[in-house]
Swiss-Prot record:
Keywords: Antibiotic, Antimicrobial, Defensin, Disulfide bond, Immunity, Innate immunity, Secreted. It comes from the Eukaryota. It is found in: Secreted. InterPro entries: Defensin_invertebrate/fungal (IPR001542), Scorpion_toxin-like_sf (IPR036574). It comes from Crassostrea virginica (Eastern oyster). One of its GO terms (biological process) is defense response to Gram-negative bacterium. The keyword Secreted applies. It holds the Pfam family Defensin_2. Disulfide bonds join C4-C25, C11-C33, C15-C35. This is Defensin-1. Its main location: secreted. Belongs to the invertebrate defensin family. Type 2 subfamily. Has antibacterial activity against the Gram-positive bacteria L.lactis and S.aureus, and against the Gram-negative bacteria E.coli D32 and V.parahemolyticus.
Amino acid sequence: GFGCPWNRYQCHSHCRSIGRLGGYCAGSLRLTCTCYRS
């Protein structure tokens, strides 16, 4: 979701839009957008 696995930047932007520091594509096939705070 949110651009994963192909568009990592879209995931990162989504995470920033909800108040996180950024995000990356995670999971076995990098299908999940995972946000991080620090």
